[in-house]
Regions:
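Bacterial N-terminal signal peptides that target proteins for export
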Residues: 1-10
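C-terminal motif of bacterial Sec signal peptides marking the signal peptidase cleavage site
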Residues: 18-20
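Disordered inhibitory propeptide/activation segment of secreted metzincin zinc metalloprotease zymogens
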Residues: 22-69, 73-75
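Catalytic zinc-binding patch centered on the HExxH motif and its immediate surroundings
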Residues: 56-60, 76-77, 114-140
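Acidic helix-start/capping segments at beta-turn-to-alpha-helix junctions
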Residues: 65, 69, 97-118, 185-186
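Zn2+-dependent metallopeptidase catalytic core
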Residues: 75-99
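Metalloprotease/metallohydrolase-associated module, dominated by Zn2+-dependent proteases
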Residues: 126-156, 172-224
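Active-site recognition of the HExxH zinc-binding catalytic motif
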Residues: 159-171
Length: 224
């Protein structure tokens, strides 16, 4: 009699336990691929741009990026540029590919003194600058200027190469959220991507994100 009661108790407990497990698994599986912090940071840096248009929508490329080098880069500049291209291709190379070309470019990166920054229609006070053009929020052309003036340390130039090329992907805003992020608003010497920087690039070129999306649409698709 006692053994029967024990058996019934065990069956009852198992019946309670397994539905709970099933519910837990469904809840876990229904979670978004991205955290709230990642989504919040993405909407901060990917909607609109620091300069120019104030329209808060997604802009990005839908074709491979071909980069032509102009001006007078030094050896370290070229090493940095190649490393940044490699880093970006590692993140989104299955979506779009970045490469260096001698002609038929859609990005010009200009290593020039500040006195020649008019090439990029640069806002005053910048030692690195990007200026992109788009149609229907699809980017098709960019000019990047990197200052070669002696006042700059190589570490600063290398930082700006990474920052300006990354932002020309469509992540056009700065932020004060993460000091070591390539998108940090104040002057830094960041030489590599944080994991959250990589995530921002990944999200922008994910299948969920489309040119012209507004904040509500972005948040909705990323939370699914």
């Amino acid at each position: 009699m006692i053994s029967n009661k024990i058996l019934l108790s065990c069956i009852f407990i198992l019946c309670l336990f397994f539905p709970c497990c099933s519910f837990y698994e469904q809840t876990e599986n229904s979670k978004s691929d991205y955290t709230d912090k990642e989504i919040e940071y993405f909407t901060e840096i990917a909607l609109g741009s620091e300069y120019g248009s104030n329209v808060q929508v997604i802009r990005r490329w839908d074709s491979d990026i071909k980069i032509k080098i102009n001006g007078n880069p030094n050896e370290k500049d070229l090493q940095t540029l190649n490393q940044v291209i490699s880093d970006i291709n590692e993140i989104i190379g299955d979506k779009i590919n970045l490469s260096l070309v001698d002609s038929n470019q859609n990005i010009d990166i200009n290593f020039v003194p500040l006195s020649d920054f008019s090439i990029c229609n640069a806002a005053p006070g910048n030692y690195g600058y990007f200026n992109c053009k788009w149609i229907n929020n699809v980017i098709y052309e960019c000019d990047i200027c990197i200052a070669t003036d002696d006042v700059l340390l190589q570490e600063e130039r290398s930082h700006m190469i990474r920052e300006e090329l990354t932002q020309s992907l469509g992540l056009m805003n700065d932020s004060l959220e993460y000091r070591d992020s390539i998108f940090y608003e104040e002057w830094t010497y960041t030489q590599k991507y944080l994991e959250i920087d990589k995530k921002m690039i990944e999200i922008l070129y994910s299948d969920k994100i489309k040119p012209g999306m507004v904040k509500q649409e972005v948040e909705s698709v990323l939370r699914k």
